[in-house]
From Swiss-Prot:
The gene is purL. GO terms for cellular component: cytoplasm. It comes from Staphylococcus aureus (strain bovine RF122 / ET3-1). Pfam families: AIRS, AIRS_C, FGAR-AT_linker. This is Phosphoribosylformylglycinamidine synthase subunit PurL. Its EC number is 6.3.5.3. InterPro entries: PRibForGlyAmidine_synth_PurL (IPR010074), PurL_linker (IPR041609), PurM-like_C_dom (IPR010918), PurM-like_C_sf (IPR036676), PurM-like_N (IPR016188), PurM-like_N_sf (IPR036921).
């Protein structure tokens, strides 16, 4: 008789306990077919988390297959803890982005902190040392106190974990819109570097080899966290606070260093982070990849308190834990290493040749499941979408007051400087950061070399909402441009697909169309997808977020010497590259004037993107350009103002466009500054101005003139978010 009080197999079926765990009737019946019997309580829980949306991608898997995943530089693509891309000299860059949206909505500090910790462990599990962190965040508007609380908590959580573990946070993006009220998006990305011969895989093979648990003792925190992340947020979500994990960055630091030492041992067979679904996913996935079985003896698992059941052990998402498979007879070597780093560890099982996932506690069997169906045979749902009717009419912007519009856009939190928030992150720890958070991609030197890794993270939610296919292309192209802007060669990307409920036809169609656009852009821009994450059911009280695919992209700088003087100077001429059109659908201007975004916009010419990108990258590396900035949210006038304010330089510009085109967000444009004495040879580059040593920012068109003090612009732009957060308290 079991020492743990749990529902019987009959009660699970009759009372439909499986539904509370997240399994549908159809899925429960499939589990019964796989087992040839009714599952017990622990087995039902295991299937529920492994077949959750968060772990199985059961609504998105068909779309992910569209993405190109191989390329000249790709060493390891989707399927492992993170993607691995060659950077030459027997070195590789390892990177991935993950979401922690639902936990951050309930417990913003811990939700964000554990999101950072989890993505770090994904990189470390490959064997790479992390070199920087990035994040992409979405919140509701800051005139709402709940959104202020969420923003403050998330930023503190990101900084609190990253700063303590000693990894710089070097880039990010934050946007605000009421569509994210109560459902913030917290996407964390980590980048690491590794030598080719140290790359690890999460595999369990070699009959008789031992399974070692290391890290924090297992508690009851985070139980069914993967299932929670696969549900819509409701008024009952607050009661699921225990599903939010608790991070410990100091143990995280010890675990990182111990893991990086362990991978130097030849006796290590495989390693995987215990992330979503905890011990269940890490162990069963390792067995599936190794074509093996596993027998875990759960009484050997280090626990925080007595009485934790097998069900709780397997579904707990206690943080700062890793699972290793090591050669039989070498266990003590690893246990001694972990003891040296003051970490709890234990041998908890072994690899078998049964292809079954067997769990015992004091010799009593609590689960006996075939490995392959558990890990690889979650049902895949192909639903029916419904095309949105796009509004092809044109809004009228002829009545706008240019100066008033300029200042309203400049101080909107989406456009305003994020330094008030980013200054809470350690951007320099490790002393390899070359370009910090600001106007373009970040750049971090590869220690001991003259190479650097450029990284960026970007999203274009309003455009994806207006036209998912074109918006999908745009988000990839935006990340590409941000890497080009620092002279990097884009190598590959990771993605985080944040959407509402796929069971709603319009949202399912958004998934179909946006991933198609993303895949096309990846193919043309030669940026294969090597890792990623899907977060669905991002809804609050029945209202969905904007469809928000986020792209993290990395690029290589072979020699950083050109960055020594890559900063705009007085006397540099300014050029605009790319055409400006009447392009306001999805723009900040449309939202400001009309309160919503629902109009079409110009399609993106991806072949032109590639050609412009190569020309600009060449001009940077040849020392012609002192600065490159992509024209983004708010349009050209806002881009020029941010350039002037960020560097404290005067600016004088004359541009032959209309007043409204000052705020157009036509894609594929760059503002570049050309060094004195240098000549720019790029087709269709138009000279538009000059950087000066005055405090004057002056932009003229045939129809208007904006003339303001740079110091005033800087004060408004840099102070807007702080003002929102302090005056509303």
């Amino acid at each position: 008789m079991s020492k743990f009080i749990e529902p019987s197999v009959e009660e699970i079926k009759l009372e439909k306990v499986y539904q509370d765990m997240g399994l549908s009737d159809q899925e429960y019946e499939k589990v019964c077919d796989i087992l040839g019997r009714q599952p017990n309580f622990t087995e039902t829980g295991i299937f529920s988390v492994m077949w959750s949306e968060h772990c199985s991608y059961k609504h998105s898997k068909p779309f992910l297959k569209q993405f190109p995943t191989s390329g000249e530089h790709v060493l390891m693509g989707p399927g492992e803890g993170a993607g691995v891309v060659d950077i030459g000299d027997n070195q590789a860059v390892v990177f991935k982005v993950e979401s922690h949206n639902h936990p951050s909505a309930i417990e913003p500090y811990q939700g964000a902190a554990t999101g950072v910790g989890g993505i770090i462990r994904d990189i470390v599990s490959i064997g790479a040392r992390p070199i920087n962190l990035l994040n992409s965040l979405r919140f509701g508007e800051l005139d709402n106190k709940q959104n202020q609380r969420l923003l403050k908590g998330v930023v503190k959580g990101i900084g609190g974990y990253g700063n303590c573990i000693g990894i710089p946070t070097t880039a990010g993006e934050i946007e605000f819109d009421e569509r994210y009220d109560g459902n913030p998006l917290v996407n964390a990305m980590c980048v690491g570097v590794i030598n080719h011969d140290m790359i690890q895989k999460g595999t369990a093979k070699g009959v008789g080899n031992s399974v070692i648990y290391v890290g924090l003792k297992t508690g009851r925190d985070g139980i069914h966290g993967a299932t929670f992340a696969s549900e819509e947020l409701t008024e009952e979500s607050e009661s699921k606070r225990p599903s939010v994990q608790i991070g410990d960055p100091f143990v995280g630091k010890k675990l990182m260093e111990a893991t990086l030492e362990a991978i130097t041992f030849d006796e290590l067979v495989g390693i995987q982070d215990m992330g979503a679904a905890g011990l269940t996913s890490s162990s069963s996935e390792m067995a599936a990849k190794g074509g093996s079985g596993l027998h875990l003896r759960l009484e050997q698992v280090p626990t925080r308190e007595p009485g934790i059941s097998p069900y709780e052990m397997m579904l707990s998402e206690t943080q700062e834990r890793m699972l290793l498979v090591v050669e039989k007879g070498t266990e003590q070597k690893f246990l001694d290493l972990f003891d040296k780093h003051e970490l709890d560890s234990a041998v908890i099982g072994e690899v078998t040749d049964t292809n079954r996932f067997v769990l015992t506690y004091d010799d009593e069997v609590y689960a006996d499941i075939p490995v392959e169906p558990l890990a690889d045979e979650a049902p895949v749902f192909i639903l029916e979408g419904e095309e949105k009717n796009y509004n092809t009419s044109k809004n009228d912007y002829t009545h706008i007051d240019v100066k008033d519009t300029f200042f309203k856009l400049l101080k909107h939190p989406t456009i305003a400087s994020k330094h008030y928030l980013y200054d809470q992150y350690d951007q320099q720890v490790g002393a390899n950061t070359i370009i910090k958070p600001g106007l373009q991609a970040s750049v971090v030197r590869v220690e001991g070399t003259n190479k650097a890794i450029a990284s960026t993270i970007d999203g274009e939610a309003r455009y994806v909402y207006n036209n998912p296919y074109e918006g999908g292309k745009m988000v990839v192209a935006e990340a590409y441009r941000n890497l080009i802007a620092v002279g990097a060669t884009p190598l590959a990307m990771t993605d985080c697909l944040n959407y509402g409920s796929p069971e709603k036809k319009e949202i399912y169609q958004q998934l179909i169309d946006s991933t198609k656009g993303m895949a096309e852009a990846c193919d043309i821009l030669k940026t294969p997808v090597v890792s990623g994450n899907v977060s669905l059911y991002n809804e609050t009280k029945g209202t969905s977020i904007f469809p928000t695919p986020v792209v993290g992209m990395v690029g290589l700088i072979e020699n950083v010497n050109y960055l020594n003087d890559f900063e705009p100077q007085v006397g540099d001429k300014l050029y605009l590259i790319g055409d400006t059109k009447d392009d306001f659908g999805g723009s900040q201007l449309e939202k400001l004037i009309y309160g919503k975004v629902n109009h079409e916009f110009e399609s993106l010419d991806l072949s032109s993107e590639s050609e412009k990108g190569e020309s600009i990258k060449t001009a940077i590396r040849e020392g012609v350009l002192s600065h490159v900035q992509t024209v983004g949210k708010g349009g050209l006038l806002i881009t020029l103002a941010k350039l002037s304010a960020h560097y404290g330089l005067g600016l004088k510009s004359s541009i032959d466009i209309t007043n409204t085109q000052l705020f157009s967000e036509t894609q594929g444009r760059y503002v570049v500054s050309v060094k004195s004495g240098k000549t720019l040879n790029i087709d269709n580059a138009i000279e538009i101005g000059l950087l000066t040593d005055s405090d004057n920012f002056k932009v003229t068109t045939p129809y208007t003139e904006i003339s303001e003090n740079v110091s005033d612009i800087k004060q408004i732009w840099e102070g807007a978010i702080a003002q929102c957060l302090t005056t509303q308290d």
